[in-house]
Each structure stands twice: as structure tokens, then as C-alpha cells.
């Protein structure tokens, strides 16, 4: 696969000047990118990106998204569905990297991989994509739920292609985790791209502990909350709540039994 076969898609509802990911893309000479913008916003937002903008029909995408009986219509899940449709109708591309508009660390010169640049970014993406295809892994990662009552957002890094199933990309908040656990039970791992591409600047997140209390803990959002981190060290799973331990690893929305979620590709490979 050549670099030209890979599209870069950025989910955004902001004008260009406020889009951190686009700022870093342009700073590091990533000229070929598309900003996925939901319909119903001010025309000025799409206009600020010029030819890089693609406005998708929110209502059409929502028809395809399964919200598991909830009323939470998460913008990220709808946006990812739009990316699914986009890549399927683009014969010039074989796959796409989907980024959140505040995930500039992946393509910036401030990442935890200081040598990351245009060339190495594509090489890493291609290597992880090939690994996922060879092993039947859904390649993607998210960090979300920090402010579920106000933002209802998910931070995205996903690798998608024309073969990806809609249902695999339309989960929201806890349901992302539920979907991942379901896949692991069936022998398919959900691997966080944040394991190899992550921003050291994402060091604080808030977890709602009860109706009124929130606590800030230090973590690398995309890695420490990914299944890859649990795969690397089972102790990263949230086995029990410990209010005195602010470095207790990945804070899942469910208690996890490591033996139950070990993927069959590890146990039987």
C-alpha cells in the first residue's frame, strides 16, 4: 500500500482556526486531508476549510447508527458512520485514518514518539493496519466519557477501510467498551492505535465517581483507557475502585475479569 492510498479524515464541528488536528497536519506538511462536518451547522465552518471540507447528512447517518435503545445520539458515532460511507465511495483510497479534531498529538512534533513525521506516520499506520487485517482485529481506539453530561464525546483514532462493518463503528461511550468486550469474547481484539501513536499532552481526565463528585487523575487517555493497555498488563484493568490510588491505570466503566476478556488469538495462537 502506498501513502497515497491512505486518506486522513478529521471529525470536527469547529472552524479551522480552532481545529488543533488540522493545524498540526498543515504544520507537518500533511496536505491530503478531509474534514468531516455534520450538516446543520453555520456555513462559515465548512467554508473555512475550503476544498478540504466534506459536509455529511446527519439525519441519513443517524438512520444507520444503532444507539442501543438510548437517546444519546453521540456526534462521534455519527461521524464515524459518515467516514464509513465516505471511504466506500472513494476509489482512490484503500483506507482512512479517522482523527478527532483535538487529537493533534498524533500528527504533531510534540508526540511521545519525537521522530514521528509524515513518512513515519504513514509507515506506522500501514503496519498497524496490516496487523489488524492479518489477525482480524478491529483497529481503533477511543477515549471518552470524561464529561458525559455535557459533551457526550469520544476522542477517536480509527483505521477504517471498505470492508469495515457499520456496526463495528457506531458505538457510544460505555457501549464502545461493551462492544469491545463482546468482540473479545468472540476472539476478536479491539486494538487501540493509541498504543503506538499517542499524545503526551493528554494527561488529565475526569471521572464521575457519583452524582456530585468528580476526580482528576493523571493518565495518557488514548493508551491507558485502551484494551491494548490491558493486554500489555492486566493490572491496568479496573478490577476494583480504590479512592486512594490516583494511578490505578485504565478506568473502565465496568469491572473486568481478565480471564473472561483474553482474546482467543492470544490464548490459542
Question: Each predicted region: which residue ranges?
Answer:
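C-terminal catalytic/acceptor-binding lobe
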Residues: 4-6, 14-20, 171-173, 177-269
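Well-ordered, non-membrane alpha-helical segments in soluble/globular domains
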Residues: 19-21, 78, 114-131, 218-225
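Catalytic metal- and UDP-sugar-binding loop of GT-A-like glycosyltransferases, i.e.
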Residues: 99
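Short, hydrophobic beta-strand segments that form beta-sheet elements in well-ordered domains
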Residues: 8-10, 32-39, 136-141
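Conserved catalytic core of nucleotide-sugar-dependent glycosyltransferases
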Residues: 104-185
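Short, well-formed alpha-helical segments that are part of the catalytic scaffolds
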Residues: 10-29, 37, 41-46
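Short aromatic/hydrophobic "clamp" motif used to bind/position activated sugar donors
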Residues: 96
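Active-site-proximal specificity loops/subdomain of glycosyltransferases
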Residues: 37-93, 104-113, 117
Amino acid at each position: 500500500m502506498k501513502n497515497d492510498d491512505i486518506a486522513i479524515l478529521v471529525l470536527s464541528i469547529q472552524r479551522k482556526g480552532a481545529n488543533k488536528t488540522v493545524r498540526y497536519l498543515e504544520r507537518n506538511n500533511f496536505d491530503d486531508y478531509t474534514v468531516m462536518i455534520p450538516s446543520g451547522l453555520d456555513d462559515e465552518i465548512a467554508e473555512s476549510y475550503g476544498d478540504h471540507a466534506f459536509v455529511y447528512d446527519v439525519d441519513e447517518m443517524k438512520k444507520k447508527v444503532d444507539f442501543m435503545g438510548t437517546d444519546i445520539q453521540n456526534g462521534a458515532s455519527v461521524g464515524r458512520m459518515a467516514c464509513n460511507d465516505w471511504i466506500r465511495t472513494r476509489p482512490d483510497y484503500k483506507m482512512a485514518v479517522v482523527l478527532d479534531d483535538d487529537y493533534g498529538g498524533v500528527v504533531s512534533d510534540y508526540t511521545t514518539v519525537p521522530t514521528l513525521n509524515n513518512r513515519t506516520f504513514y509507515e506506522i499506520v500501514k503496519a498497524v493496519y496490516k496487523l489488524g487485517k492479518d489477525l482480524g482485529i478491529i483497529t481503533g481506539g477511543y477515549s471518552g466519557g470524561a464529561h458525559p453530561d455535557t459533551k457526550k464525546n469520544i476522542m477517536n483514532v480509527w483505521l477504517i477501510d471498505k470492508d469495515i462493518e457499520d456496526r463495528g463503528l457506531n458505538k457510544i461511550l460505555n457501549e464502545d467498551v461493551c462492544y469491545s468486550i463482546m468482540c473479545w469474547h468472540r476472539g476478536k481484539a479491539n486494538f487501540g492505535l493509541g498504543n503506538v501513536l499517542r499524545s503526551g499532552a493528554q494527561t488529565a481526565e475526569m471521572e464521575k465517581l457519583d452524582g456530585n463528585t468528580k476526580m482528576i487523575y493523571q493518565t495518557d487517555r488514548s493508551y491507558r483507557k485502551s484494551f491494548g493497555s490491558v493486554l500489555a498488563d492486566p493490572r491496568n484493568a479496573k478490577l476494583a475502585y480504590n479512592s486512594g490510588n490516583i494511578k490505578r491505570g485504565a478506568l473502565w466503566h465496568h469491572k473486568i475479569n481478565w480471564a473472561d476478556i483474553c482474546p482467543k488469538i492470544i490464548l490459542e495462537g
